[in-house]
């Protein structure tokens, strides 16, 4: 199990990926402690001096003008958590909950939230013990922060609600006891610090980014395989073409294709002197389309990495000045827009893959048997597999509709513009699953197409890609139950079977 020493504000994308993929052990770097303690001291001074500060000794939202008596401050924070735990939908899986918790810890440990070290350590203990609060997937509009999801997370700290421990749903109090942990009592501002933030939105979008990276790499490999299967030209990947345009994503994607389509290919040699002038766009324009997608992936990474290390609480405690200032860092508009742009990229990756599948079905375009099977008529081959890919590509076009342009006012119009970032991030998961299904069909089809070039082989890396599939899925000589083959290819893609053939591109 990996151990991550958390230096607040310095989480890397690879660390976040590890948190999502595997249980981890967290340690808080000692450099964070002074800042955490200073912010708590500032909050305590405000309470002791009788000053009014939002979220410390006032109500919330439209009730911000209501002053709360000192003796009610602890109850105020507990009531906040209980009342805001109003999410609905299926529980998030352990990986997503773990990622949200780590993001929350990272933000709180920056020392702007006025939350005690002991509460942050209690959150770290949940992660390290594998106690995962039950967090429903739906119920946040991404401003004022992800209130409902983070309230459900916080319930477990209080010994309320449910949590998963060693794969079993238990009352939170029981889960804590089995893990050797104790509930905490919240002090002034701590409930608000736990609930305010963009951590759920950011985690949702990060998962979309992680899956998009795998899909991108897999699609590049399958695009190269299809190029070989239909005897496509390698000249469109010439570095001079892409340097003339100057789009970095395009330049880098063309380089990836040259890496995969090396000169040592019997298929390439077989049609080196053919008279075909130009390939269809789905082959020839792969660097341009996939390059644009890569640019979106890189921009999304930049935004999400900044947000993963951000302080998105409100109000913020500036201990050096003894001030607590209300702002709007909880508004997840940057995350929503990044997720919307990523959705476009995921949709286009799948759409281009589907067009290449369709190209292979057409005997006039591919110079292969119709639907990639001999004895057509008796056999339908890949006919309906391409229909499945088309259905998935069409679904993605609808799912790619932007969420960040939507807004509904909440909290009696006090919170009158919201980001819808959680929904923007969450739909990426469905889009990724759809696109993975499309690419799986292309992988199956392209390998079948190369098989049908009897006696000819592709480049060494692409032969690895074909061999990986053929170890699990046999060549099609006649029709058979098709769905299990798509499922197998999809599972291999999710495991990174093709991603490992592509050099780092992010």
UniProtKB/Swiss-Prot annotation:
Pathway: Amino-acid degradation; L-histidine degradation into L-glutamate; N-formimidoyl-L-glutamate from L-histidine: step 1/3. GO terms for molecular function: histidine ammonia-lyase activity. This is Histidine ammonia-lyase. It catalyses: L-histidine = trans-urocanate + NH4(+). It holds the Pfam family Lyase_aromatic. The modification 2,3-didehydroalanine (Ser) is found at residue 144. Belongs to the PAL/histidase family. Contains an active site 4-methylidene-imidazol-5-one (MIO), which is formed autocatalytically by cyclization and dehydration of residues Ala-Ser-Gly. Keywords: Cytoplasm, Histidine metabolism, Lyase. GO terms for cellular component: cytoplasm. PROSITE patterns: PAL_HISTIDASE. It is found in: Cytoplasm. Its main location: cytoplasm. There is a cross-link at residues 143-145 (5-imidazolinone (Ala-Gly)). Its EC number is 4.3.1.3. CDD domains: PAL-HAL (cd00332). One of its GO terms (biological process) is L-histidine catabolic process to glutamate and formamide. InterPro entries: Aromatic_Lyase, Fumarase/histidase_N, HutH, L-Aspartase-like, Phe/His_NH3-lyase_AS.
């Amino acid at each position: 199990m990996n151990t991550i020493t958390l230096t607040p504000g310095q989480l890397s994308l690879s660390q976040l990926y590890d948190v999502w993929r595997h249980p981890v052990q967290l340690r808080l770097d000692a450099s964070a402690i002074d800042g955490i303690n200073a912010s708590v001291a500032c909050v305590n001074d405000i309470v002791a001096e009788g000053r009014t500060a939002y979220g410390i000794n006032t109500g919330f939202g439209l009730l911000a003008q209501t002053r709360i008596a000192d003796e009610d401050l602890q109850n105020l924070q507990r009531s906040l958590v209980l009342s805001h735990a109003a999410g609905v939908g299926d529980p998030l899986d352990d990986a997503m909950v773990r990622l949200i918790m780590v993001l929350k810890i990272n933000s709180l440990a920056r020392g702007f939230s006025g939350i005690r070290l002991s509460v942050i350590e209690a959150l770290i203990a949940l992660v390290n013990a594998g106690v995962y609060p039950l967090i429903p997937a739906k119920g946040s509009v991404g401003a004022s922060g992800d209130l409902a999801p983070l309230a459900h997370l916080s319930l477990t700290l209080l010994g309320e609600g449910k949590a998963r421990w060693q794969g079993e749903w238990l009352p939170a109090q029981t889960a804590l006891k089995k893990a050797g942990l104790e509930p905490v009592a919240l002090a002034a501002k701590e409930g608000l610090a736990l609930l305010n933030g963009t951590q759920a939105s950011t985690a949702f979008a990060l998962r979309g980014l992680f899956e998009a990276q795998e899909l991108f790499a897999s699609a590049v490999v399958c695009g190269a395989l299809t190029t070989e299967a239909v005897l496509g030209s390698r000249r469109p990947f010439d570095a001079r073409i892409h340097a003339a345009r100057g789009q970095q994503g395009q330049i880098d994607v063309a380089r990836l294709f040259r890496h995969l389509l090396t000169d040592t290919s019997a298929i390439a040699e077989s049609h080196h002197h053919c008279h075909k002038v130009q390939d269809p766009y789905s082959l020839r324009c792969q660097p341009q389309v996939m390059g644009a997608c890569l640019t979106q992936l890189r921009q999304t990474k930049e935004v999400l990495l900044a947000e993963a290390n951000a302080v998105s609480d409100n109000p913020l405690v500036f201990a050096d000045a003894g001030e607590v200032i209300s702002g709007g860092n909880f508004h997840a508009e940057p995350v929503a827009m990044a997720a919307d742009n990523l959705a476009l990229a995921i949709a286009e990756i799948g759409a281009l893959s589907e067009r290449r599948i369709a190209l292979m079905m057409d005997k006039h375009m591919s110079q292969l048997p119709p639907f990639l099977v001999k004895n057509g008529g008796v056999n339908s081959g890949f006919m309906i597999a391409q229909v499945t890919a088309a259905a998935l590509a069409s679904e993605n076009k609808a799912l790619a509709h932007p969420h960040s342009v939507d807004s509904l006012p909440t909290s009696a119009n006090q919170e009158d513009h919201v980001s819808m970032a959680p929904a923007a991030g969450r739909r990426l998961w469905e889009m990724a699953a759809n696109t993975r299904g499309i690419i799986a069909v292309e992988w199956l089809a392209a390998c079948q197409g190369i098989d049908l070039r009897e006696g000819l082989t592709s480049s060494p890396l692409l032969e690895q890609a074909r061999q990986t599939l053929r170890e699990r899925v046999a060549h099609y000589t006649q029709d058979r139950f098709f769905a299990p083959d798509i499922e197998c290819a999809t599972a291999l893609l999710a495991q990174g079977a093709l991603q490992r053939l592509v050099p780092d591109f992010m």
